[in-house]
Amino acid sequence: MHVVSTKQMLNNAQRGGYAVPAFNIHNLETMQVVVETAANLHAPVIIAGTPGTFTHAGTENLLALVSAMAKQYHHPLAIHLDHHTKFDDIAQKVRSGVRSVMIDASHLPFAQNISRVKEVVDFCHRFDVSVEAELGQLGGQEDDVQVNEADAFYTNPAQAREFAEATGIDSLAVAIGTAHGMYASAPALDFSRLENIRQWVNLPLVLHGASGLSTKDIQQTIKLGICKINVATELKNAFSQALKNYLTEHPEATEPRDYLQSAKSAMRDVVSKVIADCGCEGRA
């Protein structure tokens, strides 16, 4: 097994009526939990990293780790650039071996978004790299980027078709009421908008900001065309809360291999639940 593109993963999900979870990883323990759990459940998963994650860990290190774990567990894995904005940064990582990219130019006016995305698509497709882009903009914070709720806006279904056709993207991230981070109360997702987008666009659709969504809402979005579910904050929260609890109960603890086990156990529960919600167990 080896590092693969997300294109076939998401096309399979679109045909099969399930979604592939993309887990944002932040350290070795997160990677171990995601891959081990996915392999045990025979579920396809995507290892995602923001620019900050790649800077923290190093592109070559992440690629080597994903490749080694794919071979160790005999499980296909995709490593994905999440919310990358700079062409030169994307190009460098693609040349290093990354095979899945999200170019996020959603903050730009429509025409400029198309232009920026098409530049990335034209480059990436030369290397058989799949490209995701976003139309509409989610509120909340992702990496170092903060989008105020007032500046967030939903995806326009008619524009979505024009955007997809003009850019040649392989998947489309949509804005239907989710946000980055956890929710103080359950969000009201615009399912009718999602259904309209699917009628206009015959591409795998992507849902960002899925941390904290109910199983019912996740499964409804999948019925309406979502093929990739992004989860980041829920993993971070599980990790940090379990770690805090352990160190509070065991203030004398100094061995990382001991106290990190509680954090891994908490994350394992999250990963298992997300895989179940996505309906992708046994699909790898």
Curated annotation (Swiss-Prot):
Origin organism of this chain?
Shigella boydii serotype 4 (strain Sb227)
Function of the protein = Catalytic subunit of the tagatose-1,6-bisphosphate aldolase GatYZ, which catalyzes the reversible aldol condensation of dihydroxyacetone phosphate (DHAP or glycerone-phosphate) with glyceraldehyde 3-phosphate (G3P) to produce tagatose 1,6-bisphosphate (TBP). Requires GatZ subunit for full activity and stability. Is involved in the catabolism of galactitol.
In terms of PROSITE patterns, this protein maps to: ALDOLASE_CLASS_II_1 (PS00602), ALDOLASE_CLASS_II_2 (PS00806)
Q: Which domain of life is it from?
A: Bacteria
Arranged from A to Z, the UniProt key words for this protein are: Galactitol metabolism, Lyase, Metal-binding, Zinc
Question: For this protein, what does the record note about how its cofactor is bound?
Answer: Binds 1 zinc ion per subunit.
Q: Which GO terms describe its biological process?
A: D-tagatose 6-phosphate catabolic process; galactitol catabolic process
Pfam hit, one:
F_bP_aldolase
**Protein name according to UniProt:** D-tagatose-1,6-bisphosphate aldolase subunit GatY
Gene Ontology molecular function terms on file? tagatose-bisphosphate aldolase activity; zinc ion binding
Q: Which residues of the sequence carry a binding annotation for Zn(2+)? A: 83, 180, 208
Gene Ontology cellular component terms for the protein in this record: cytosol
Annotated gene: gatY
Which pathway or pathways does this protein act in?
Answer: Carbohydrate metabolism; D-tagatose 6-phosphate degradation; D-glyceraldehyde 3-phosphate and glycerone phosphate from D-tagatose 6-phosphate: step 2/2
Record: residues binding dihydroxyacetone phosphate:
181, 209-211, 230-233
Q: Which reaction does it catalyse?
A: D-tagatofuranose 1,6-bisphosphate = D-glyceraldehyde 3-phosphate + dihydroxyacetone phosphate
Which InterPro entries does this entry report, sorted A to Z? Answer: Aldolase_TIM, Class_II_FBP_aldolase, FBA_II, TagBP_ald_KbaY/GatY, TagBP_aldolase_GatY
Subunit text: Forms a complex with GatZ.
The EC designation for this entry is 4.1.2.40
Q: What class of enzyme is it?
A: lyase
Where are the active-site residues found? 82
Q: Which family does it belong to?
A: Belongs to the class II fructose-bisphosphate aldolase family. TagBP aldolase GatY subfamily.
Cofactors (names)? Zn(2+)
UniProt keyword Metal-binding, yes or no: yes
